[in-house]
Amino acid sequence: MPELNNFTYERLQKLVAVVFIGCIMVLFLSGFDTIKSKSRDVKRRADVKILVKALDMYHDKYGKYPDSHNDWQGWDLSIGYNGGKVDFIDRLKAEGFIDREIKDPINDVAYHYRYQKFQAGDYGCQTSFYILQIAGFELPSENNGQGECPELNWVKSATNGYTVQDFD
């Protein structure tokens, strides 16, 4: 009889060890997903800084920001549209203002970059301007950028994203 109790005790110890290791793995893996999401959000911010610099160089060379070509409701999207190319990013690359294709790390309907050039008078802004947005971050963000006309606050159109606005 003592052998049976000893056997059961050893099995119980092993079971506790396996459960403990399983719990640690679950905690590690859930934290790992957060780390991956954070790194993708950091890349998104870095990409937008590169795109803003490239847009400024384009403006310096041509005296205006590039036009958007209405991939989707006036926006040029980093996901393209119906398999189309991303016009403003392609133009910046072709002109040598960026040296690689820039796209969101996930680059789908929820997570992408979008750009639109607006004319003077649109939404009450007196001069032409562009809006560049990160459509969404994976983690909540306190800094959502800036972009506003008298008739529309662009930051509110990408509530957990990031907005950049600049005027011609």
Task: Outline where the language-model segments fall.
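N-terminal alpha-helical signal peptides/signal-anchor transmembrane segments
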Residues: 32-35, 47-65
